Amino acid sequence: MWRGRDVISARDFNRVDLEELFEMAKYMEKYAKSRVEFLKGKIMAVAFFEPSTRTRLSFEVAMKRLGGDVIGFWGAEGTSVEKGETLADTIRMLDAYSDIIVIRHKYEGAAKLAAEVAESPVINAGDGAYNHPTQAMLDVYTIWREFGTVDGLNIGLLGDLRHARTINSLLEILTNFKVRVYLISPELLRPRVETINYIQSRGLMLSFHTNIEEVIHELDVVYVVRIQKERFIDPLEYERIKGSYKITLDTLKNVKKNLIILHPLPRVDEIDHRVDSTPYAKYFRQAAFGVPLRMALLYLILQP
């Protein structure tokens, strides 16, 4: 089911795929701080044209924990890309040297192009402002590990839901489960119409809100993304909106006792640091799950 597959869009995976991935990730948790030889002799090429900390490092650690090796680059500096080499030619070279390619790029569609060119499987580690499928898989895996299920939960997405690529992929993944999603953002920062139309066509229950205080008592999960300052022409408008989409201790006064707060990280100031010490804060555990989740992904794709 997974062997040899590309991971380009969250839309390409169904519930059976995800449940198989989650079970394998849970199995891989016991190896996340050790080394096994499941992928001994395999080489992963990383092509990160954009900055990354958690995604890049967790992929590299995952491959090394599985006994494989890593080659590649982080930024175009010092590569033939600086000389004008095309993306397609760069991918062809990496394909010749490796068994799987992990790519991050600022342009939407870059991962799809890479998959069309390469014979080896390609994993999209984020392209443009739209796709980040492995982050969405990690997010939903964290929910699954915390609650033992995803079905039946009320999930709130808070912040800039238009420009955060994690949001698009997360919504697409969630269409495989029986959940209700609360979209909490300024109207101008709601997800793209195309995304909304797709997830509604898949039967996902949606509601739109502009105030977290009005709905947080109903939520089982709050998934926070930052309000992106660079999207605002008027800095005063940014300051006004930013403060309305922040999680503080006061925000958490009347929440469910088993509420969890997630964030793809890095954060700026959208979650008060005092929230870190509450039982609701699960974003660091979420980040830690990145290694076993990506170990599972690599193993399932490259398994003998």
Curated annotation (Swiss-Prot):
Where are the disulfide bridges? none
Which InterPro entries does the UniProt entry name for this protein? Asp/Orn_carbamoyltranf_P-bd, Asp/Orn_carbamoylTrfase, Asp/Orn_carbamoylTrfase_sf, Asp_carbamoyltransf, Asp_carbamoyltransf_Asp/Orn-bd
Q: SUPFAM superfamilies this protein is in?
A: Aspartate/ornithine carbamoyltransferase
Q: What reaction does this enzyme carry out catalytically?
A: carbamoyl phosphate + L-aspartate = N-carbamoyl-L-aspartate + phosphate + H(+)
Q: Name one GO biological process term.
A: 'de novo' UMP biosynthetic process
> What is this protein for, i.e. what is its function?
Catalyzes the condensation of carbamoyl phosphate and aspartate to form carbamoyl aspartate and inorganic phosphate, the committed step in the de novo pyrimidine nucleotide biosynthesis pathway.
The text of the family note is: Belongs to the aspartate/ornithine carbamoyltransferase superfamily. ATCase family.
**What protein am I looking at?**
Aspartate carbamoyltransferase catalytic subunit
Gene this protein is translated from:
pyrB
